[in-house]
Amino acid sequence: MKLESLHKLWIHELKDLHSAETQILETLPRMVAAASHDELKMALAEHLQETRTHVSRLEKIFKSLDFSASGQRCKGMEGLLEEGRALLED
C-alpha cells in the first residue's frame, strides 16, 4: 500500500493500533485465567481494562473522522500474541 500523504499514513497507523489493541482484547482473558500468581493475574486484569479503554478511545476517534477502524490486521501484534498463546499451551 503506497501512502501518499501524512493523513493517509496517520489513518493507516490508527488502524494498525486499533487492530493491535483488539487482538490483545481477544487474548488477555485467557492469559488472566491461566495466570497462577495473584499479582500477575491482577496486573493482566488491569491491563485488560486499560486495553478496553484504548479500543473505546480509538473507536471514538474513527467515528469523529468518519472512517472505519476495520480492514487492517496488525501483523506484529499477531506474532507476539501467537508466541503468548504457545506459552499458555506448554
Residue ranges of each PLM-predicted region?
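Amphipathic alpha-helical hairpins
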Residues: 1-90
